[in-house]
Each structure stands twice: as structure tokens, then as C-alpha cells.
Swiss-Prot record:
This is GATA transcription factor 18. Residues 74-109 form the Tify domain. InterPro entries: CCT_domain (IPR010402), TIFY-like (IPR045280), Tify_dom (IPR010399), Znf_GATA (IPR000679), Znf_NHR/GATA (IPR013088). Transcriptional activator that specifically binds 5'-GATA-3' or 5'-GAT-3' motifs within gene promoters. Residues 143-185 form the CCT domain. Pfam families: CCT, GATA, tify.
Length: 319
């Protein structure tokens, strides 16, 4: 019996649960809908806040962009004034030339020419290369000015191969050339000189050889001695032997054979010099044996008996 009562109670509870399930489900759905609605409203509010934040941040981005730097040399319009100061570019609209003139006079500047506006326009073509410099605001004004001066100087450069100075041109024209190139003295020595120069050089060489072809002491030819040396009469006046003795002892050596040979040569020359009529006008030069100095051995050999005879003669007289 108790078991049957318990089973009946369990069945009633199950029925009650089955009846209450749809109501709970409906109630749960309503709660979920309410939560979803709350979440949706929160998301909408966040989106509205984001849009408002974007709207607040957009105005600075929507501000008109800063005017591009324009050079004072390249005005956009006749009444537009552009100033460049410390890398900053300032553009002023509707500025008449009269106002600019008044400001310049107030600052103590000179009077602006009346045709300045007309003169600036042609410079636009010439100053196109300065746009990249003048449009940059990160470069100081001094740097911009120095770059402009550099570019102005670069325009004057001339890379053509030509002589620029008149002095250098004159020097180049005076210099000797060999196959179109400048030739120095060393290169010109191998080349033949002009006929006049050759004759002059030959004449001077012959005179030089005739003057200094023989030793003044012994008459030795220049070709018969290793080198001509300095003597009392100057350089290249003595042969090698005479010059060495003169340099070492300060005296000239005796050359009897050379004197005899020189006298014979002089005799032959005098015999050869005959007048056209066949009569010799020069006297015959005969070497005098007394003038020929004896050699050192002969002097030593002959002097001893002579001295003994001289010494013995007074002794004989005294006896």
C-alpha cells in the first residue's frame, strides 16, 4: 500500500511538471528576449558613441590641407606674395605690388623696380630646377640659399675640351709638337734640325774641334787620348797625361819627342803652303837640336862625368 501511494504521488508530480513546463518556457523566452533587447540597446549606444567619437576626430582631418610651399620666385598669381623664412613657406593672397613696395620701404630696403612683376615671369622657366628645394620645409633657409648659389655656378661650368685662357693658348702655340702632341727637348734631339740650324751647328762644331782638338803642351790629338783635361789655359786644353800631372803637381811634363814631332809637322805644313807662282814664301823651319831638352836618363848619365871633370880641374890647377 505504501508503494502504491508513493507511485500515485510521483505521477501527480510528473503531471504538474508537464503542465508547468510550457509556462516556464514562455517565461524563460520572455526573459531572454529582455536580455537580448538590453544587449542590443547597449551595442547601439556603443556604436553611437563610436560614431560620435569619429565625428569628433574627423574635423581635424577634414581641415583644408596646408598650402603647398610656393617659391617667391614662382608666384602663382600676380597678387600672391610668397615668403620663405627659416624653411617655412608663407603664402599671402591678394597682396598688391604697392603694398609690397610700402613694406620694403618701411623696412629700409631699396625701391622695387616698376617692372618687377613682368620680370619675374620669365624666370619661371629658368628656376624650374629649384622646385624640389623650395618645396621642402625641412631644409633651413641658409641651406636652400647655398644650394641655389651652387646650382647657379654649375650652370656656368663648361665641360667642352678647349683652352679657356689666352695665355695658355699662346704657350701651346709656341711649344714644339711631334705628331700633334707636345714634345720636350729630349724628343726633339732625335729629330733632324732645320738646314740653317744644321749649318750653324756644323760650323760651331768645326770651330770647337779646330780650337780644342790637340793638347797645348804635347800636341796630342783629342782622338789619341782618353779624355781632355783642364790646364792653365782652361778646360779641355790638355791631354789626359798632361792634365793629370798638372792637377797633381801643378807643373807641365816635358815632352821632347812631342816637340820634335810638332816641329816636323810644322815643317811639312810650311812646305805644303806654296804660293800659286810655285815659290815658297815661308821660311823653312828646321828644328834646333840645342833646343831639344834631354831626357831624365840622359841628363843623369851626362852630368856625372861633367861634374867630375869640373871638380878635378881645379884640383889639378891647385897642385
Amino acid at each position: 500500500m505504501p508503494d502504491a501511494a508513493a507511485a500515485a504521488a510521483a505521477a501527480q508530480d510528473a503531471d504538474a511538471v508537464m503542465r508547468d513546463a510550457p509556462a516556464d518556457a514562455a517565461a524563460g523566452g520572455g526573459d531572454n528576449n529582455d536580455d537580448d533587447g538590453d544587449d542590443g540597446t547597449e551595442e547601439d549606444e556603443e556604436e553611437d558613441d563610436d560614431e560620435e567619437g569619429d565625428e569628433e576626430e574627423l574635423p581635424p582631418a577634414e581641415d583644408p590641407a596646408a598650402p603647398e610651399p610656393v617659391s617667391a620666385l614662382l608666384p602663382g598669381s600676380p597678387n600672391q606674395l610668397t615668403l620663405l623664412f627659416q624653411g617655412e613657406v608663407y603664402v599671402f593672397e591678394s597682396v598688391t605690388p604697392e603694398k609690397v613696395q610700402a613694406v620694403l620701404l618701411l623696412l629700409g630696403s631699396c625701391e622695387m623696380p616698376p617692372g618687377l612683376a613682368n620680370m619675374v615671369l620669365p624666370n619661371q622657366r629658368e628656376n624650374r630646377g629649384y622646385d624640389d628645394l623650395l618645396q621642402r620645409t625641412d631644409i633651413p633657409a641658409k641651406r636652400v640659399a647655398s644650394l641655389i648659389r651652387f646650382r647657379e655656378k654649375r650652370k656656368e661650368r663648361n665641360f667642352d675640351k678647349k683652352i679657356r685662357y689666352a695665355v695658355r693658348k699662346e704657350v701651346a702655340l709656341r711649344m714644339q709638337r711631334r705628331k700633334g702632341q707636345f714634345a720636350g727637348r729630349a724628343n726633339m734631339e732625335g729629330e733632324s734640325l732645320s738646314p740653317g740650324c744644321e749649318l750653324a751647328s756644323q760650323g760651331s762644331g768645326q770651330d770647337f774641334l779646330s780650337r780644342e782638338s790637340k793638347c797645348q803642351n804635347c800636341g796630342t790629338s783629342e782622338k789619341m787620348t782618353p779624355a781632355m783635361r783642364r790646364g792653365p789655359a782652361g778646360p779641355r786644353t790638355l791631354c789626359n797625361a798632361c792634365g793629370l800631372m798638372w792637377a797633381n803637381k801643378g807643373t807641365l811634363r816635358n815632352c821632347p819627342k812631342a816637340k820634335v814631332e810638332s816641329s816636323v809637322v810644322a815643317t811639312e805644313q810650311s812646305n805644303a803652303a806654296v804660293s800659286p807662282s810655285g815659290i815658297d814664301n815661308k821660311e823653312l823651319v828646321v828644328p834646333n837640336p840645342e833646343n831639344i831638352t834631354a831626357s831624365h836618363g840622359e841628363v843623369m848619365g851626362d852630368s856625372t862625368p861633367a861634374n867630375e871633370a869640373e871638380i878635378g880641374a881645379p884640383k889639378a890647377q891647385s897642385q
